[in-house]
């Protein structure tokens, strides 16, 4: 839920840290019904697609209860498991605010839910993307530590002027990451698990490249926010993310300053290519060719 730049102060009605009350009691039945529709169609298809850590998190937080979750309820279990809580925010928050929340084990989640006609695509993350997509993974201790470390690293990246590189790491792991498991590729990224169409595309479509995770490679790679990804990076396990947090990012930023960015569809020497994509979807015009990302 991060926006751009530094905070110039919260909007009216928000606290200094940009949080607001969730106002769970104000949701209408129609809004609860949207959650139920989204939840049921995602969980029906995610078995055998989402990683075990995500599926265990769904169960641990009892997110299958009917309707939009009450943050106060899920926070009791989440805090017990990993020390994290979910806090409501009015929308995208500035980068410095976002990093501060993560560094203190608070995940900022949008309070609103999409309209019924927006089930398959929404430009700004809503409560379904943020809570269904992100929060189950926060029940895993290793992933929870990674997210806190990311927040701490974000504050340093802002000071060094390397936010673009760090944002790519978040994008290609937390939002659109895949994992190699003994049972095959599995999804752990929130942008995929919360999207019916991208849950299929990311694993099954021949279009995108699927490349083994390499930290510096990921931090050099551009990304697109308007459609399916043209490349997915694949970790071997959640432990890979723990290893990332132990790296000297200062030295990495120095090296990245002297090399060029990598395009979204490029394969470069040294890549561990799992799937060399056809890029047919992007070449045909992406969503304009008939497929919708959600």
Curated annotation (Swiss-Prot):
Keywords attached to this entry: Iron, Metal-binding, Monooxygenase, Oxidoreductase, Phenylalanine catabolism
Catalytic activity: (6R)-L-erythro-5,6,7,8-tetrahydrobiopterin + L-phenylalanine + O2 = (4aS,6R)-4a-hydroxy-L-erythro-5,6,7,8-tetrahydrobiopterin + L-tyrosine
Pathway info: Amino-acid degradation; L-phenylalanine degradation; acetoacetate and fumarate from L-phenylalanine: step 1/6
Family annotation (SUPFAM superfamilies): Aromatic aminoacid monoxygenases, catalytic and oligomerization domains
Protein residues bound to Fe cation: 129, 134, 175
EC number, UniProt record: 1.14.16.1
Alphabetized InterPro entries for the sequence: ArAA_hydroxylase, ArAA_hydroxylase_Fe/CU_BS, ArAA_hydroxylase_sf, Aro-AA_hydroxylase_C_sf, Aromatic-AA_hydroxylase_C, Phe-4-hydroxylase_mono
Record note on cofactor: Binds 1 Fe(2+) ion.
Disulfide bonds: none
Cofactor dependency: Fe(2+)
GO MF assignments: iron ion binding; phenylalanine 4-monooxygenase activity
NCBIfam families: Phe4hydrox_mono, PRK11913.1-2
Protein name: Phenylalanine-4-hydroxylase
